[in-house]
């Protein structure tokens, strides 16, 4: 099938025609994947000089409008337009539907086929007479996961990658599960994307049945069970969702190349890579773990670069996240590059074309958006002005980082001074029928049930599970709050965050959660102040000794646990407070622990747990923050060189 694509969106240089030819590319098991190859109009394979290729593998439709290609002030672009842009610059462009999606054959099992299928696709590209055999990959979210999955198998032809907001380092700890709990974005994504499955697209009655499902109502009836879920009409999607949900221990299921780069770092493709994410994205930990590991593989021949913004998942040109505005500087355009297309074009020029391959650039290794420093007032769009600025570094964490302990003290105090009391503790009752509602955070794919971002931590009718609109979460009896006095000077927190607790419970299993908050003082616009969530995490206590061999708790026995919220970068201004909220649920971000020892995916007998956090000298529960001297921060150099990439 041949189409001609005309580009009317970008500059005149990309307006030349490009031809699009669809191929059904066979994989090693005989399943064929629908693959569009975009070449210059009139290109003669085998006669004209071959071209380097850019590959994106996606489950979202290779010919559909691409959410990942939104530029400021413009609607999302069609993938044909994106292809024409790169074709005009001397590349072949390949878009492919993932297995079981849209025009491709086979059954869709989320993530698990992407390694072998990516390998086979890259091998096919290298064998085509229009190809130089040099391939760069790109893509957002799932299309970043597909890149990392293929790279784990060290495929032929792979020369460089641009991974935006994805690429699992260890999906058991970020992206599917976290701290032993299940991330329920997998459930919302499955239901929403099942509507685009081949079975649903080919059956109007099936489509009507799936469209009729009220997902918010289904979330109020959790846990689901196989055959008793909104996915019961689309069994291949229900099957893979419950595989993820019920595989609670870290075993061989979680060690496959599509979801576990950690197990392949030593043998994976060593190629130049850009890793990009953002503080309210669901893949902060994956991005940071991948950066830490890949930076060491071959830093000279295969450098790895890090870009961390303030935005939600993939919203690189949106200056706000939730109810908080970070200012126009938060956009990638004009800060990191002229625009995202130009950034990638320069990147692929640098690594895929012989004339420019290997040319040295002076890019910072890490470009980080430091949130904070704004007025704290409400802007014209109704968002709190938190502000921020880009900084740069040659490493992560930053060189001058001082990892500082803040101890949880009696009376709700968070202090650098260790406790003096020997037996201090605080207890609360956790009722799984009344979980703490999720109010923002590092979330994606949650519509129509939940949303990510930065919000004042008070209940609001916008958020699923709200029972008392307008009331601060801190007023709940099952949340324990610790905060510093107002800061006497600005404090920059940039890096990984760790919460170490000594706990006990009268239940055989329970969860503990931790949320780091910047408490902005009261002002005219926010007379009650603004408690802005920065990052949070969770720990399922049956894994206190091992992720692979769970053990129930003994009632009353004290255990040490570690919660690892995602890394962050925030300037706490003078007069602000640092706050840590401890609780035992965060729903619907995570599934709710029934406290009974049952699997949360299948529980039938939930119970109330009395949970205790210890604060004394023998069990000094504490928060560890990465503090960087404000005067040691290096501002990102202004973008003046049009060839800066």
Language model: regions and residue ranges:
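Cap/lid segment of the alpha/beta-hydrolase catalytic domain
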Residues: 44-127, 168, 174-177, 182, ...
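Glycine/threonine-rich phosphate-binding loop and adjacent beta-strand/alpha-helix elements that clamp
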Residues: 3-8, 19-24, 325-343, 352-645
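A catalytic-pocket lid/entrance helix-loop region that shapes and gates access to the active site
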Residues: 138-213, 279-280, 298-346
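Active-site-adjacent alpha-helix of alpha/beta-hydrolase-fold enzymes
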Residues: 78, 285-304
